[in-house]
UniProtKB/Swiss-Prot annotation:
Protein's UniProt name: Shikimate dehydrogenase (NADP(+))
Catalysis performed (reactions): shikimate + NADP(+) = 3-dehydroshikimate + NADPH + H(+)
Function: Involved in the biosynthesis of the chorismate, which leads to the biosynthesis of aromatic amino acids. Catalyzes the reversible NADPH linked reduction of 3-dehydroshikimate (DHSA) to yield shikimate (SA).
Cysteine pairings via disulfide bonds: none
UniProt keyword annotation of Membrane present: no
Any one biological process term the GO annotation gives: amino acid biosynthetic process
């Protein structure tokens, strides 16, 4: 049986083994998937040992995505663009291919929710300029989204916008200068909801037709989504579906098929709300 793991620190609360257990049952692909705690500063050592002992693939979570980027032998375009790897496949020749499925997982969930529509150019506001944002920009730009990127430290947003401008239409703005208009989609990729804070953007950015998506998820509504609801937005979602979506695209890298994410999302949501 082929062996896969999720590597991180901490790792005990990772949902990945449960998600892949559900995917395995759904697809009929029999593979072993576990957790692997990696001591800080020892990613290369642990990863080398895992793959030398027969491991075929891995997911990588915080804080090792940049370590994985440097560790692998080859990179997909999306991994190269975002400078981080969350999925690894050992190829037949023994080399390691690094991918980043976070952004594609987001696209899959946004499409499931009808927050994005094929062929339509959407006006998208992305809040935050950290690693989470870096992982989602290329897939959004490939989907012809017109992106405004905002961040408390506007210089970080400007640097990121310049870096990704070769892939599509993207600009940076200070939060207080975000254009007073209703965006088609607002994505909170900042850490504000982790501390129950609200992103410092004008309330006028929200609207009845504005879809709002928080990369963070928890039982109940995040602070960002609650604030969006109070300001007229009714199409709301947290990032649980993105978590499942990025796992589904890891399966695609490993087995060339994408599992249906809906049943797994429903089960995880039920467990989360218990």
């Amino acid at each position: 049986m082929e062996k896969y793991v999720v590597m991180g620190n901490p790792i005990e609360h990772s949902q990945s083994p449960f998600i892949h257990q559900l995917f395995s049952k759904q697809s009929g692909i029999d593979y072993e998937y576990g957790r692997l705690l990696v001591p800080l500063g020892e990613f290369d050592k642990v990863a080398t040992q895992f793959f030398s002992q027969g491991g075929r693939g891995a997911n990588v979570t915080v804080p090792f995505k940049e370590d994985a980027f440097r560790f692998v032998d080859k990179l997909t375009q999306r991994a190269q663009a975002c400078g981080a790897v969350n999925t690894i496949l050992k190829l037949d020749d023994g080399t390691l291919l690094g991918d980043n499925t976070d952004g594609q997982g987001l696209i899959l969930d946004l499409a499931r929710l009808d927050f994005i529509i094929p062929g339509k150019i959407l006006s998208v506001l992305v809040i935050g300029a950290g690693g989470a944002t870096r992982g989602i920009l290329l897939p959004l730009l490939n989907y012809n989204c017109d992106i405004t990127l905002t961040n408390r430290t506007v210089e970080k947003a400007q640097q990121l916008a310049q870096e990704f401008s070769q892939f599509g239409t993207i600009r940076a703005s200070a939060p207080q200068n975000v254009t007073d208009k209703h965006y088609d989609l607002i994505i909170n990729a900042s850490s504000s909801s982790m501390t129950d804070d609200i992103p410092p953007i004008p309330d006028s950015a929200y609207g009845f037709k504005t879809a709002c998506y928080d990369l963070y998820y928890k039982a109940g509504m995040t602070s960002f989504l609650y604030h969006a609801l109070k300001n007229g937005s009714t199409r709301l979602s947290d990032g649980l579906g993105m978590l499942v979506g990025q796992a589904a695209y890891a399966v695609e890298l490993w087995y060339e098929r994408v599992p249906d994410i809906n049943p797994t999302i429903n089960i995880l949501r039920e467990n989360l709300n218990k």
